[in-house]
Structure formats: C-alpha cells, structure tokens
Swiss-Prot record:
Organism annotation: Shigella flexneri
Name assigned to this protein: Alkanesulfonate monooxygenase
Pfam family, one: Bac_luciferase
The protein's Enzyme Commission number: 1.14.14.5
Quaternary structure, from the entry: Homotetramer.
Length: 381
C-alpha cells in the first residue's frame, strides 16, 4: 500500500526548541511559502494547516499558497459552531475551484472552553458534537448539489444551495479526529478519513477497530490517518540527541503551566495524550521509538517517532499494517525537517507521490441572475 505523507505549516510559530524564544524565528508569509514549496517538491501529498486563536487564519494561508505550489493539497479546518455550514460550503467549493481540486477539509469541534467562549461558543462537549453532526450533514448535502432545508437542534437552514460546485466530486474529502464515543460515531457516519494522534500501536489498533465497526454499522468504509512528529537523523543516536535538544530549554514551570492549560479542555484525545507522560520528563519513550516529549508543552499531537530512516520507516509500516494510509508529520524547525524527512525517511517507504493536477475546465457561465440562479441556454424560436 502506497502511503500519503503530509507535512505541516507552523502558523503558530516555529524554532529549534520547545517552550522558549531561544532559537525561534519569524513565521511570515515568505517562510510559510518556503515550507510549502519544499513539501511540494519533495513529494508530500499535502500540508495540514492548524486552526485556533494561537494560529494565523488557515483559510487565508491556504489560499495564499495556491499560486506558489503545483501539486500540494491543503488540509484546512472546518469549524462547526463558529461558521455556518452554508458559508463553509461556499468557502470549501471556492478553495477547491481556485486550487484546481487541491482542497481537503478537517472537521474541528474545539475542546478548550475558554477559547470557545472567546469565539462566542458556549456549548458543552456533547452539544458541540450534536452541532458538528448537523453541520456536517448540511455541508455535505450542499456540496453534493442539493437544495437543503434542515431544522435541527443547533442548525436551521431553509432553501440553502450552492451555485458553484467543487472540482472534486462528489465533494472534497473530509477528515476528522476525536477519541470520545460520540466523536467516533460522527466519524463513522459522515467523514471520509478518521485521524488519530500518535499513540502506541496497540492503542491505535483499538481505536481503528472501534471506528471501523461503527462505520460498518452504517454500511460505510472509512480510511485512517495518524498525526505524528518525526525526528529522523542518519543514526539512532543522533536522533535521540536531537530529541533531547528539542526540550533542553524547558523548565518545570513552563511544563506545569502547559499541563494546567491542557487540563481545562474537555478533549478525550488530549487527556489520552497527557496520560502518556503525566507531565514528567522521565520515561518519555512510551513505545519503541515513540517519544512523548513534545506533549510536555504542545497541545494536540504530542508524540514523535525518533530514529534513523530505516527505524522510523519500520515504525510507520507498523501503523500502516493496522490500516493507516495517511501520515500527517511535522518536525522542528519545519523547513529543515521537511527536507530531512524527505531525504532520510521517504527512500525507505512506499510513498505515494502526487501528480500535478491538470487544469479542470469550468463551464462558461453568465452573471448570476437576481443573485439566485445561473443562466442557462434558452432554446431559440
């Protein structure tokens, strides 16, 4: 099975070390463009663009990278409860059309009550997943070309429609990650690819089996992906030394503050990440070559595969054997590590190198009539 390898655009900051200004660098458009172009040339399938108040806006960043890349796809967040599904469908179709079919979407429900309150969202965990399920139903139906009337608990639309369809049919693929039962149910019913953070293989296997069984109950099959950091070097010793350097400027106070911030979230996935290290520096290798040091201060994906190219490739193939076909990777700093992964790891894997998409001709159309419909040819009498 050929593997889809993704990279990451660090719109929330970048540098040589975690938890310090030491070794940091400005993350401006030029720098993000360098990373995107490196990923494009090296054969990555796409890039994940993060979302939230700590990040630049993912949609604007993705749009700005379209003209400077050729094949790279952009995995961009959909935010139920923050954006209406109708507006999100228009945005999604436009990004797909402008990029010639290079748009992918990642459903993000949110997990930090403090950040959500700042965005005007005051739903609890179960309510957010109710809203996300309704959002996704409407979003998908619009992209399928339906005129949608929907009267849910959280979402209400009447006569919603999309005049400009996406390039990818029936719609651009929808990704989603969540560890709670309600999250897995949403994934099983509505999404195309279920993402998990980098837990030990036995825990990942358990999640995959659960989601696969739930999807089968809906008569569906679902793909799987995993989100990991990577520290790959020419030797295993060099890789482990690089891992230790990454957290060499961390102090106990910074770790404690980070763990306190994570504790206020209601994310089951974040709780599972934190349990891998319990906020302590000792015993960070939680599974062969799987290191939890990143999660001491980074929310979300908190584990890294560490080793030389063949060793990391072996670990990746263990995950692939569980049914995972997509790997969303990152490393610090992201420009240099994009090259290291491409040069030291890719030769040891069966990497699916994306082709440059051919321009898709769009149908000629006149100006929309009354802001309501697209004019069609009228038979001449």
């Amino acid at each position: 099975m050929s593997l889809n390898m993704f990279w990451f655009l660090p719109t929330h900051g970048d540098g040589h070390y975690l938890g310090t200004e030491e070794g940091s660098r400005p993350v401006d458009h030029g720098y993000l463009q360098q990373i995107a172009q490196a990923a494009d040339r090296l054969g990555y399938t796409g890039v994940l663009i993060p979302t939230g108040r700590s990040c630049e806006d993912a949609w604007l960043v993705a749009a700005s990278m379209i003209p400077v890349t050729q094949r790279l796809k952009f995995l961009v967040a959909l935010r139920p409860s923050v954006t209406s599904p109708t507006v999100a469908a228009r945005q999604a179709a436009t990004l797909d059309r402008l990029s010639n079919g290079r748009a992918l979407f990642n459903l993000v429900t949110g997990s930090d009550p403090q950040e959500l309150a700042g965005d005007g969202v005051f739903l609890d965990h179960s309510e957010r997943y109710e809203a996300s399920a309704e959002f996704t139903q409407v979003w998908r139906r619009l992209l399928l070309g339906e005129t949608v009337n929907f009267n849910g608990k959280h979402i209400h639309v009447r006569g919603a429609k999309l005049l400009f369809p996406p390039i990818q049919q029936p719609y651009p693929p929808l990704y989603f990650g969540g560890s709670s039962d309600v999250a897995q149910e949403l994934a099983a019913e509505q999404v195309d690819l279920y993402l998990t953070w980098g837990e030990p293989p036995e825990l990942v296997k358990e999640k995959i089996e659960q989601v696969r069984a739930k999807a089968a109950a809906y008569g569906r099959k679902i793909r799987f992906g995993i989100r990991l950091h990577v520290i790959v070097r020419e030797t295993n010793d060099e890789a482990w030394q690089a891992a230790e350097r990454l957290i060499s400027h961390l102090d106990d106070e910074t770790i404690a503050k980070a763990q306190a911030a994570f504790a206020r979230t209601d994310s089951v996935g974040q709780q599972r990440m934190a349990a891998l290290h319990n906020g302590k520096r000792d015993n960070l290798e939680i599974s062969p070559n799987l290191w939890a040091g990143v999660g001491l201060v980074r929310g979300g994906a908190g584990t890294a595969l560490v080793g030389d190219g063949p060793t990391v490739a072996a670990r990746i193939n263990e995950y692939a054997a569980l049914g995972i076909d997509s790997f969303v990777l990152s490393g610090y700093p992201h420009l240099e590590e994009a090259y290291r992964v491409g040069e030291l790891l890719f030769p040891h894997l069966d990497v699916a190198i994306p082709e440059i998409p051919q321009p898709q001709p769009l149908n000629p159309q006149g100006e929309a009539v009354a802001n309501d419909f697209i004019p069609r040819k009228v038979a001449q009498s």
